[in-house]
């Protein structure tokens, strides 16, 4: 139970889970633990690994973990936490994204002990008749208990009928897999409960539910999301990961320790006490960044990332910056930053100039109207973006 509950938001129903654990221990039959992810983006970020870490902990206890790729449900679009209809993905987008999902998840899970499934296996054969029969097992009133549906209904925001199907299809996954426990973020609680109810309808023992907190992004405000730009991708370069993790606030660091670190809780509590007594929290942040980077890359990469970070902090330039060859001199500074790939747009370039975040050969550029002449120089935007530009 201690492993199950570490860092979790809610365990339903705790007494039932204890009974399942006891039965598994007595019979030697591992419990079936399910986690489903819709491949809505091509990469996994560390926010996704909060539930993956929990899966790995339960996997290490000998239970059977099932990594479910929602290739069917992705064509519907999950309405969880949405204030408008989520556009469904095409089959081509789903297939392209799914290719990287399991490979990246295997950085956390033990692939030799992981059952990988696609929910199109049982959802596609249902057909219209099967889906209608499934829909008959749940009422509109129950569906409207969802907080996001209720808010949209009261606000007069349209709710499409197909959005009601999403939690039903996700719940049917639990029936097909005969899961004993389903994991998900706190925003998935309703969907997980639907699975529990549908299992009862199909005469199965209902699954227990374990919800994990949604990881707050680097900004410390909103949940981690690629669309919000406040994320750390698990496939990012070690130096980039290190810089991003060192940018989080000292308070947020402890949340990251609880949800992302494999260190014993007693050790984390001791570090908190040491910081209270005067230890520099930066030291603890370095340890966290190195642990996460070593998990997805290597310990050697983590050490090199620390060296690079310290080098930059002293005003140094990284050794491995890209070299960009451009023509058109003289050229406006904002346009040059865009062409060099250091800023996504000229407006973003101008914002960085206004904030004093642009340097050429170590000199801060404050003139947005600057015309840059031909030459070779190092350009820097913020603390982590560098390029050696050869302009002709």
From Swiss-Prot:
Q: Where in or outside the cell is it found?
A: Cytoplasm
Q: Which reaction does it catalyse?
A: tRNA(Tyr) + L-tyrosine + ATP = L-tyrosyl-tRNA(Tyr) + AMP + diphosphate + H(+)
Q: What is its main location?
A: cytoplasm
Domain called S4 RNA-binding: residue spans: 331-391
Q: Which GO terms describe its molecular function?
A: ATP binding; RNA binding; tyrosine-tRNA ligase activity
The UniProt record gives the binding positions of ATP as 226
Can you list the GO cellular component terms from the UniProt entry?
A: cytosol
Keywords, sorted A to Z = Aminoacyl-tRNA synthetase, ATP-binding, Cytoplasm, Ligase, Nucleotide-binding, Protein biosynthesis, RNA-binding
User: What Enzyme Commission number(s) appear in the record?
Assistant: 6.1.1.1
Protein's job: Catalyzes the attachment of tyrosine to tRNA(Tyr) in a two-step reaction: tyrosine is first activated by ATP to form Tyr-AMP and then transferred to the acceptor end of tRNA(Tyr).
Q: How does it associate, per the subunit comment?
A: Homodimer.
Name under which the protein is recorded: Tyrosine--tRNA ligase
User: Organism, per UniProt?
Assistant: Ralstonia nicotianae (strain ATCC BAA-1114 / GMI1000)
Question: Which taxonomic lineage is given here?
Answer: Bacteria, Pseudomonadati, Pseudomonadota, Betaproteobacteria, Burkholderiales
